[in-house]
Amino acid sequence: MVDCTKPIAESNNFIILDKYNPDWKITESYQSEGDLERELIQDLVNQGYEYLPTLNNTKAMLANVREQLQNLNNVEFLEAEWRRFVETWMDKPSDGVVEKARKIHDDYVHDFVFDDGRIQNIYLLDRKNILRNKVQVIKQFEQAGTHANRYDVTILVNGLPLVQIELKKRGVAIREAFNQIHRYSKESFNSENSLFKYLQLFVISNGTDTRYFANTTKRDKNSFDFTMNWAKSDNTLIKDLKDFTATFFQKHTLLNVLVNYSVFDSSQTLLVMRPYQIAATERILWKIKSSFTSEELVKTGKRWVYLAHYRFW
């Protein structure tokens, strides 16, 4: 059991921790990439993720997305309805990374007309009650493009691949995992009918150093310099993969980072906050909520915080 208690301002809703005490020792023995992958998946399962060991192709992924969206929206698609939903909105052939990011952050609800004429809002995400979103993990997903690739570990939210994790064995430079992400971006992530265009975050790790960064098409944001370590509220870095998993990959934390602490801005750039920015935002929002009961004041304060933090990107 990990002691990761007392978030800042002593609120259980905060995700930047003031205190984090792991009860394991950092391994100093040799760990292959496969060892890291198996340990990561087991740790995620222990934290409540559903592991889908046989989901490794596009057909299986689409079937799972259908199941998860039906559960989230309390609806059932007929085969023709589902095909129409996918082809005309969820995975339009003309969509690229920018359009998919907009569907996650701005246009996450779609007014769908069923064959019997009824209209219902279909949500990709529940942004109000984030723990209603189903979190799953898969490994070794195979996808063709200009080259065929097989991805290490992918985190699905309501069936959609939103986080891609690439691992290298301990001792290998983490930049190799970073370079691999960019090779996949060129070769297969963004290929035709690829749901990996929905990716929002990348995580790279060699076991001893773990970093995250946003999926963006902006070349100046595509640098290794924009990768970030997770951290505690005093800016102590959380670098080892096991510690990163126990903190950043807690479902409540990851969903908050994806939904509340990532910004798709007016220049169509996807930005994700650094830990100190999130900590500052959480403090301000907590003070606003403590002082006012008006929901609109909370929303206004949150918008102000996002704007204020642009200077730090």
From Swiss-Prot:
One of its GO terms (molecular function) is DNA binding. Gene3D superfamilies: 3.90.1570.50. It holds the Pfam family HSDR_N. GO terms for biological process: DNA restriction-modification system. Disruption phenotype: Manifests the latent anticodon nuclease (prrC, ACNase). Its EC number is 3.1.21.3. It catalyses: Endonucleolytic cleavage of DNA to give random double-stranded fragments with terminal 5'-phosphates, ATP is simultaneously hydrolyzed. Keywords: ATP-binding, DNA-binding, Endonuclease, Hydrolase, Nuclease, Nucleotide-binding, Restriction system. Belongs to the HsdR family. The type I restriction/modification system is composed of three polypeptides R, M and S; the restriction enzyme has stoichiometry R(2)M(2)S(1) while the methyltransferase is M(2)S(1). The subtype C restriction (R) subunit of a type I restriction enzyme that recognizes 5'-CCAN(7)RTGC-3' and cleaves a random distance away. The R subunit is required for both endonuclease and ATPase activities but not for modification. Cleaves only non-methylated DNA, hemi-methylated and fully methylated DNA are not substrates. After locating a non-methylated recognition site, the enzyme complex serves as a molecular motor that translocates DNA in an ATP-dependent manner until a collision occurs that triggers cleavage. This is Type I restriction enzyme EcoprrI endonuclease subunit. The gene is prrD.
